[in-house]
Amino acid sequence: MGTEFNGLFDEWAHTYDSFVQGEDIQYKEVFAHYEDILEDVVNKSFGNVLEFGVGTGNLTNKLLLAGRTVYGIEPSREMRMIAKEKLPKEFSITEGDFLSFEVPNSIDTIVSTYAFHHLTDDEKNVAIAKYSQLLNKGGKIVFADTIFADQDAYDKTVETAKERGFHQLANDLQTEYYTRIPVMQTIFENNGFHVTFTRLNHFVWVMEATKQ
């Protein structure tokens, strides 16, 4: 993952929270049950947590309230500024991304929501291989993101978006790197993880991978 999305992140920073609240009709289904999705990620995490894509701090706040020690990584300067306004003053967010980041001393869980699709499938594999080296046996990766059961599910979702006049959503689905469950299952298993997938809305699945 390079810096190609940083401009988008900065632009989106000031409207992101309205998106997750369902105020944009095109993305309402993408963010359906948003709070439940965040809670599910929190409940599946434990110990010292490395969070990629802090964004405006919504998941971070829930992790902190649940007593987790959190190390936050966020590439967008604008996102970091907004998150710092919402989070405890002593909490620090480090600039970085899924592939380039400062490694904390000890990590039990790696989490992210609505962000892993910014990596190509090859980059996803590189990232998971790196995380496998950071986690001990029993350590976890818990990612919530838009993925698809198979190619047919993806094709139908894009077609439906176009039929409903949701051209921005359709373009998003066709230009970013939304992957398929079999691809992610292979990536996780090849890097020493047992993984399960739980669907929480039409778009979003929670991937819970445990290091073997």
Curated annotation (Swiss-Prot):
Pfam families: Methyltransf_25. InterPro entries: Methyltransf_25, SAM-dependent_MTases_sf, Uncharacterised_MeTfrase_YrrT. One of its GO terms (molecular function) is methyltransferase activity. GO terms for biological process: methylation. CDD domains: AdoMet_MTases. It comes from the Bacteria. Transmembrane segments: none annotated. Keywords: Methyltransferase, S-adenosyl-L-methionine, Transferase. Its EC number is 2.1.1.-. S-adenosyl-L-methionine binds at residues 53, 74, 97. Could be a S-adenosyl-L-methionine-dependent methyltransferase. Belongs to the methyltransferase superfamily. YrrT family. This is Uncharacterized methyltransferase BC_4369.
